[in-house]
Regions:
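Conserved ABC ATPase "signature" region
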Residues: 118-136
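Conserved ABC ATPase signature
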Residues: 140-144, 148
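A short, flexible loop at the N-terminus of ABC-type nucleotide-binding domains that lies
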Residues: 3-6, 11-23, 55-60, 76-78
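ABC ATPase NBD Q-loop/coupling interface
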Residues: 66-81
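Short helical segment in ABC ATPase nucleotide-binding domains corresponding to the A-loop/adjacent helical element
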Residues: 52, 94, 100-111, 121
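Hydrophobic anchor residue at the start of the ABC signature
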Residues: 154
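Catalytic Walker B motif of ABC-type/P-loop ATPase nucleotide-binding domains
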Residues: 165-168
Length: 175
């Protein structure tokens, strides 16, 4: 069964007169990699925001139709509940940083779930190595290049082992 399923789904921001998304029908299955491409303003980020719960939880608007994310009805779920299923790397990673250091930022969700320190440090180091940021764990995020910041954001969602990874303009700052 699909891991993401849109059925006659529309979304309209409260501040707009017309829906940004209209009658979307789309099924994405486990293991598929899907690229949504189009010109600026066509609704790519809005679609992503509906998948990860930013729309309408953080960006007020009205949704109609059906959106199922990993078996969860997104139209009736909180952003917190959806974050257990969807990891998001934003175009501007500065908006995602929470910790004082790269290591703290990567480990943030693990610490929030009360994971034992030894296990948390081990997972953080392993994921940092995978994205080639392991030599910067003690740096502050603002000390990094744009591409390094993207790697930290990616590591921060990888530690959660979510089924769905969502990238909004992931190559914008990558070096």
């Amino acid at each position: 069964s699909p891991v993401i399923s849109f059925k006659n789904y529309s979304f309209q921001y409260r501040a707009q007169k017309r829906p940004t998304l209209t009658n979307i029908n789309l099924d994405i299955y486990p293991g598929e990699r899907v690229l949504i491409a189009g010109p600026s303003g066509c609704g790519k980020s809005t679609l992503a925001g509906c998948i990860n719960g930013l729309n309408p939880c953080s960006n007020p608007g009205e949704a109609t139709g059906e959106l199922i994310i990993d078996g969860v009805d997104a139209t009736k779920s909180s952003i917190f509940e959806l974050s257990a299923h969807v990891g998001t790397v934003l175009q501007d990673p500065d908006g995602q940083f929470i910790g004082l250091t790269v290591g703290e930022d990567i480990a943030f969700s693990l610490e929030n779930s009360c994971m034992p320190q030894d296990e948390m440090h081990q997972i953080t180091r392993k994921v940092a190595e995978l994205v080639k940021i392991n030599n910067h764990l003690d740096y502050a995020p603002h000390e990094l290049s744009g591409g390094q910041k993207q790697r930290v954001s990616l590591a921060g969602v990888m530690v959660d082992q979510v089924k769905i990874l969502l990238f909004d303009e992931p190559l914008a700052n990558l070096d």
